[in-house]
Amino acid sequence: MSRRLVALSTVATALDAERIATALVERGLAACVNVVPGVVSIYRWKGAVERDLELLLVIKTRADRFEALREALVSLHPYEVPELIALPVEAGHLPYLAWLDEATGEGRG
């Protein structure tokens, strides 16, 4: 069984958030993507400190799907350098974790 991950990304618009989230779930690269509006991002970009209102994508996936997820997200994302980081899931509700595995293709023939 592959390790489970929670991946994070941000986008500027609700349209982009829904488009990317839907594509990742439809392709079996994510079991679920939460879209969290109202995230204030403060970051350095091209020598200047920037501040933007963004939407956070909280993406539940498996480690063996991450590379395909990364390729898809980068191709769908409008940013020049999209944020994508992943954190390991150390524990969770076992029925939910089983569903995550099934929704991302674990055990399918």
Features from the language model and the residues they span:
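Positively charged, small/polar-rich N-terminal and surface patches that mediate targeting and assembly
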Residues: 1-109
